[in-house]
C-alpha cells in the first residue's frame, strides 16, 4: 500500500545470499518510506455490506472517513460508525480524500464512476483502490491521472494489459472470493435469500430487481413485480382495497418491486384488479 510493502518485500527477497543483510536492510529501508493511515482521509463510494465494513475498519485505524452512497439501505446506515461523515455528492468528498475506495455493483449507471471528471476533483497524490469491478474505473483516465501526479497509486483485483508493468499500479489476480470458505458461504447465503423470498417476499442481491426487505406486519403480504413507470403506486394502492399496514417499494432500472402488508386477505377480485394494471408483471400473496 502507501507504505510500499509490495516493493519492500520484493527488494528484501533480493538480499538472499548477502553476508551483510542486517546492514543492507538499515541502509535500504529508506527507499520504502510511506505515509501512515492514522489521520489521513478515506473516501468510500458505496456503503453497502462491504463498503460499510471498510468504512468502520478505517475509523478503527484512526482515519477520517467520508462516505458517499445515494442509495444506502436502512440496514447499512444502522451498521455504520457515527464517525463516518456522509457526503451528498462526490464533489463534496473527492477534494478531501487521501485515499479513495469504491464498493458498488457494476451497472450501466456505475460504469466509469471513476473517470477523468471525478479524478480532476481529487487532491494531488490520491491513492485509489478498486476491489469491486474493473469497469467502475476508466483505465485510460486513471493512467493519465497517474502520469500527471494526480493519482499516486492504484490497487485493483482486475489485471489488464494496459495496467501491468505500470509503476504505482498493483494488481492482484482476482482474489476477492478466493478463499476455502467462500464457496460454502455463497451456497448458504443463496439458500437463505431464496428461503426469505419464498417465505416473506424479500429480495436481496438480485441481478434484475432492487433489494427490498421489510419485517412482516399484518395478516397477509402482497408482492408485486412491475414496470418502473409513473403512477404505478397510486394504481396499486387503489386496487388493493384493503387496509394497508406497511408498504415497501424500490426500483432498479426499468423494473420495480412492491411489498404491501394488509390486515385482511385480499379477495381474488382484488388480485385480478392488480394483475390487470398496465405494467404489472406478477402478483403473489403470502
Where do the protein language model's features map onto the residues?
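Residues that mark the start of a beta-strand
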Residues: 40-43, 64, 221
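Rossmann-like adenosine-cofactor binding region
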Residues: 66, 70-162, 178
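N-terminal Rossmann-fold NAD(P) dinucleotide-binding loop
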Residues: 51-52
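Short, flexible coil/linker segments at domain boundaries that flank nucleotide/cofactor-interacting
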Residues: 36-37, 123, 217
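Aromatic pocket-lining residues of Rossmann-like dinucleotide-binding sites
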Residues: 57-58, 122
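Phosphate-binding beta-alpha-beta segment of Rossmann-like dinucleotide-binding domains, i.e.
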Residues: 1-41, 205
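Glycine-rich Rossmann-fold phosphate-binding loop(s) that bind the pyrophosphate
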Residues: 47-48
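NAD(P)-dependent dehydrogenase/reductase Rossmann-like domain
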Residues: 164-167, 175-286
